[in-house]
Amino acid sequence: MAKTQMQLANRAWRTETKSLGWHHGWKTGRKGWKAFCRENATITVEEHLKTDPPFEDQADANWHVAEELTYWTP
């Protein structure tokens, strides 16, 4: 079964933020980190579909999220 755009983006946010070590230190623990990823995935999908075609696969979603995170990290 094909993944939805939201599922691809959510997994990409979890994968990419975990690789940066952002999954540690949340006051609300793992649930807080997952909620953060889910909220940002929603925004990513909305903004991405305004200007670009849908994500082709997980690697494409990961690339777009990693690219977005380069603007967040010093």
List the predicted regions and their residue ranges.
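C-terminal alpha-helical interaction appendages
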Residues: 1-74
